[in-house]
Amino acid sequence: MEQQEIIHISISEAAQAHFRCLLEQQEPNTHIRIFVVNPGTPSAECGVSYCPSNAVEETDTEFKFTGFSAFVDELSLPFLADAEIDYVTDQMGAQLTLKAPNSKMRKIADDAPFIERLDYVIQTQVNPQLASHGGQVTLIEVTEDKYAILQFGGGCNGCSMVDVTLKEGIEKQLLATFPTELKGVKDVTEHQRGEHSYY
């Protein structure tokens, strides 16, 4: 299938072995299904379930692995681009991990307008880092003199660390990604300190 060349989903050897072990206990010809609930939204969640042969749809895309296949529905497919499934063992035991960087926002083309590519990087790389502080950044506009105007929300609003975060973290990251298209970032939010501020 054409789409399989574009969309890449990787399952580590450990995770493949784990799936094979689980599937041996199921009916013959049972595979796995990888899906996204609420794809393209901040509340997107990925999951893996068993997929009996009679549950495969014509519109599904099949990814073949040793001893089993992973099926992905048409709606979830673009949001699972570059997804990685691993089976990690540590002192606390073993668990399956599923990283899908594009689940909350569809992957965009390299030749998409600059503002779309910039927003994609903010949503998939910057905001996940800020989420640990309960904060987020929204791209408001890109000025003619190549400055990205950003609005901080959540725990970042009124945070005394914003200048440091903005200049050192986000600006550095975005300039490294877009060295010719961007000169810097500016903050549009009037930072009023409130009880929800992290620092």
From Swiss-Prot:
GO terms for molecular function: 4 iron, 4 sulfur cluster binding; iron ion binding. Binds 1 [4Fe-4S] cluster per subunit. The cluster is presumably bound at the interface of two monomers. It comes from the Bacteria. The keyword Iron-sulfur applies. [4Fe-4S] cluster binds at C156, C159. Keywords: 4Fe-4S, Iron, Iron-sulfur, Metal-binding. Its cofactor is [4Fe-4S] cluster. Pfam families: Fe-S_biosyn (PF01521), NifU (PF01106). Gene3D superfamilies: Fe-S cluster assembly (FSCA) (3.30.300.130), HesB-like domain (2.60.300.12). GO terms for biological process: iron-sulfur cluster assembly; protein maturation. Transmembrane segments: none annotated. Homodimer. Involved in iron-sulfur cluster biogenesis. Binds a 4Fe-4S cluster, can transfer this cluster to apoproteins, and thereby intervenes in the maturation of Fe/S proteins. Could also act as a scaffold/chaperone for damaged Fe/S proteins. Belongs to the NfuA family. PANTHER family: FE_S BIOGENESIS PROTEIN NFUA, IRON-SULFUR CLUSTER SCAFFOLD PROTEIN NFU-RELATED. This is Fe/S biogenesis protein NfuA. It comes from Haemophilus ducreyi (strain 35000HP / ATCC 700724). The lineage of its organism: Bacteria, Pseudomonadati, Pseudomonadota, Gammaproteobacteria, Pasteurellales.
